[in-house]
């Protein structure tokens, strides 16, 4: 009975438990250096053994009580983050939770051979949908793996070699496996763009049953899907050093930038902007801003190298002739990052300080148009007269990240000021205080907003080293994740509404797989936040 009381006491006093564990190991060391004649004395030996057995029982039992919350039992409760005073401990818990959420999601959303991802799973009915995930949704699993790998590397830097050694290789292998099976979304087609006609192999929206055989013509591939994949390929390269990731990232980058509208207006300026896809004319925030950060990263990769690249453009004099030019990769990538950033800021930043969805109101219509120049067919510019659509959190999040990365690369104060203003405006616009839970901020969770919000968190994290206010903004995500984990974890999964919980009607608890991978990625991103709080 006394032991049970001690265990319960220790369960809610983790700091004391840690001290006892330390004392236990000190005692073990003491026993090892105890004089041999004393250790071999029968009575002394029995007395020491009794002391250590009792102490060992208390330590093991208390540690067990602290580990129990990590199971999948529905009644699971975890000690609140507020009880953990050491920021490194918070970060380790974040990473462990991320890995638990990710591993569980792989179990329920992927086929047994891990080749296919399904879209929905209901933890109450235990039913998985037959509908397979789109490539965008599938990419969320790769994003989560990369975030976990980044967290593991951060833990190693902090001295937690054991956590790194036990998990790093497994997630590196998972990254390679997920990347390999993404080929079920790959397909090839011939595209006439603003400057050329060329064959490309890119990612389709939907998965097919054979690698490399997807239909990617027209609207069946979109540029933003390639951008999310590019981002994760470069991140994978930076984390593992695997050259194949970088090679594919640059290939897809060439495809995406081939979609840039380099036709010129009456003043000789580029019309600019990348349409949603080769089958669309509207130019979306999601098909432009996500490319800014990856381009800065490519610039940084090649900054000290002399690698060259040849690109195509439209002559500024006659405004029709297609030309080509060869320059250093580092210069090319940084210049394009600036151009995309400037286009989106000029056309889509609204009077609320956040970003609209897209440039629309096509004139004369929204059909892809072509023109003939010197006997050769090229894509033609379509006028877009107005910024329209909902302001989604990710369209501001990508621009915060882009501003932070461009500031790091250029040290131009304009990017820092842009990033600070957009960070403040985004938090004010997207985070609603006390609307569900006191002292918590609610972010929209309908539609695909859970994933969108993770992109906003990434922006807060990326700018926080140079804009300290972002630290309090990102903490709102930590609070919401912890609240959902403490109150609503069910069968190892979190609900779509972290603060509101599950539907009373269990049949309505069909959860998007990409949301679970988004939660895992968010926890992992918070785990290697070097600012600690």
Predicted regions and their residues:
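Short hydrophobic targeting helices and cationic amphipathic motifs
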Residues: 10, 16, 25-26, 31, ...
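Bacterial N-terminal signal peptides
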Residues: 58-68
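Boundary at the C-terminal end of the N-terminal hydrophobic targeting segment
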Residues: 73-75
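CBM-like carbohydrate-recognition segments
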Residues: 79-224, 283, 391, 414-533
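Short coil/turn linking the two alpha-helices of tandem helical-hairpin repeats
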Residues: 149, 153, 237-241, 299-306, ...
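Extended ligand-binding groove/face enriched in aromatic
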Residues: 162-318, 334-335, 372-373
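Active-site cradle of extracellular carbohydrate-active enzymes
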Residues: 271, 278, 286-295, 324-403
